[in-house]
Amino acid sequence: MDIALSYQEKGSGEPLILLHGNGEDSSYFRHQIAHFQDRYRVIALDTRGHGKSPRGSAPFTIRQFARDLYDFMETRKIAEAVLLGFSDGANIAMRFAMEHPERVKALILNGGNLDPAGVKRSTQLPIEIGYRIARHFAARSAEARKNAEMLGL
């Protein structure tokens, strides 16, 4: 892995890895961390380019985020974990489970969608417009480049 992921860890026991949505970070799960830390080893990641985790040079894709999760688990000697993902975090968890089913004890998913074909046009259109605007200004603004990259997930 070309970066070190930032994370919060609380509690002990069976690993429960929390994966946030696009544009969020591990603080999204502050209430879940507090709730589950008495029963689990709760690990809330900041995925690549989110929160305190650096962007790095690898592709900014769900597939890469799943690779990062694998590397994170390998480095910390986590053989198997419960994965809880929200939105793009659910997408990361699903991708990871497809590629490494032996590493997943259970999946808890909310709002995941690996195939956006089922998303209502009224929901998708503002994202597409925002992406196009950000791409237009990406050459002149680092913030616009970052927004375009996130909206492109």
Positions of predicted regions on the chain:
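Conserved HGGG/HGGXW glycine-rich cap/lid loop of the alpha/beta-hydrolase fold
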Residues: 6-58, 72
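Flexible "cap/lid" loop of the alpha/beta hydrolase fold
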Residues: 94-99, 105-137
